[in-house]
Amino acid sequence: MISRLFASNQNVKLVRTFKSTSISMAAEKKKFERTKPHVNVGTIGHVDHGKTTLTAAITKTLSDRGLANFKSYAQIDKSPEEKARGITITASHIEYESATRHYAHIDCPGHQHYIKNMITGAAQMDGAILVVSAPDGPQEQTREHIILSREVGIPALVVFLNKMDNADPDLVEIVEMEVRELLSQYGFNGDETPFVKGAAAVALAETNETATQYGRKAIDELVEVLDTKIPLPHRAVDKPFLMPVEEVFSISGRGTVATGRIEQGTLKVGEEVAIVGIKPVPKVAVTGIEMFGKLLDFAQAGENVGCLLRGLKREEVLRGEVISKPGTIKASTKFKAKTYVLTEAEGGRKKGFATGYRPQFFIRTANVTGMIELPPTHAVILPGDSLEFTVELISPTPLSINGRFAIREGQLTVGAGVISEILN
């Protein structure tokens, strides 16, 4: 769901969405000034626990200080299906600043049917806000999002206990204990994870003059926790440029725009790149780069950008491919991976599987079917097992050693793994 990001000389506001990173362009465009370190964060958690409301509350609170543009719940949840069902389906990108950092914030879907979209969003985060409804406690997707956060490599979590205005004070301590136990169970330091207690809906209705403990004061505390508890990430700016493609659209007479988060390296306007994947393009020039509606002379690892590719048609670039420095990565169909298979209690399968099993593999932004071949020592792999096995994908996909992936079957997350060897 993307509308135009780049335009001709028209005084028109344009919006790019990965469901929606708002990127506007007018006849006179501003340049993005890097005055603060850039960090990618996001909201994860069970459906209806308040992720999108919290995202809106953060922008509302910070907008009164000139550090954000307020985005309402309706502006964040834009698609007709989302509006009709009142849930987030894809992952929304917005921006805001604290006193010391520039944040790109990804609001991830919590509904089970859209976990696959959450995987792509979570894989871009340097840290995440796990939103848990204090009256309800941790639920099915709370656990699944924690597991997926670990598997896609999110290094740090912050917990926001939401809806405190409707919570039983005697039960809040139990809910916090349950969440800490879940975090510890799945590889995070539950004892040391910071918790912020608040009510996002209350914060949305308040002003600075009427701020209360669970309202705006809780949002202020949350932003301070992000600044101090989410480590500044190391950016691989010295490696060859690589950006997984999230969304693609075309501008008549100008070319095709591909959007995504830069995984490594830097890119300057005018440089040539390659498109690697199902429809490879050996070389194409980048004639424009933007981030959150502002022009960039160059982009670097960690930034969510749109790249204007000269002369390409929209159908020549696909989600799941990568844009890279020419000659630095190839598309492959076969690899070995060290993989963990989730148990039923973790949201996985009830039964194991054997050679010939064909689930979906989520690798970067790609979603591709692959056939699993177990080693001769194993006739079957069971839930809870860890094993290295071979995967053969049905279409060429850009792969990297130590690259992470998730395995899905229907509405189940089957497992997750790390690529150990590329075989072709």
Curated annotation (Swiss-Prot):
Location of the tr-type G domain: 36-234
Region: G2, residue numbers: 86-90
Gene3D superfamilies named in the record: P-loop containing nucleotide triphosphate hydrolases, Translation factors
Domain of life according to the entry: Eukaryota
GO function terms (MF aspect): GTP binding; GTPase activity; translation elongation factor activity
PROSITE patterns assigned: G_TR_1, G_TR_2
Localization per record: Mitochondrion
G3: annotated span: 107-110
Residue numbers spanned by region G1: 45-52
GO annotation terms (biological process): mitochondrial translational elongation; translational elongation
Similarity remark: Belongs to the TRAFAC class translation factor GTPase superfamily. Classic translation factor GTPase family. EF-Tu/EF-1A subfamily.
Name of the featured protein: Elongation factor Tu, mitochondrial
Source organism: Dictyostelium discoideum
High-level lineage: Eukaryota, Amoebozoa, Evosea, Eumycetozoa, Dictyostelia
